[in-house]
Amino acid sequence: MNNAISVLPGAISIQAVYERVLKGKRADFVCLSTGYSVVIGEWYDNVFEDKLFGSKVTTREVVADTEGNRSYGQKKDGVKNQVRYLTDSAESDLVLGDDFMAIISFNPQSPYAVVIEDLSIVSSAKVWFEAIWASAAR
């Protein structure tokens, strides 16, 4: 169980977690943060989003139900890249890759990512995501 959990501080570490999903086949996200740009600037919207949509990675995202996120959802094809909405927001994200999960804190004073590579916990988180996905609005 060595290195099953890592705490990675800072915006660069958070970006590296998102970039890691590009190496896999599938990724699920619960992105309820509305203030992420305070920590990572426009990187997600202007850099990562293009890489993700241009990759072969199949994605599902549950995002906060905001006008901006509804506009973001319109960019998705609904097959390879799907989106659903929750009315709540929180300043953290959950990222599920093929073989890892990450909880991301967008606390501007101390942003960080907790990366978990213990496959039993990752499998459990994938079950949790299925429940969230099933309950989220289209």
Question: How would you label these PLM feature ranges?
Answer:
Residues 20-27:
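Glycine-rich phosphate/diphosphate-binding loops that line cofactor/substrate pockets in enzymes
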Residues 30:
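Extended, highly charged clamp/arch subdomains and adjacent linkers
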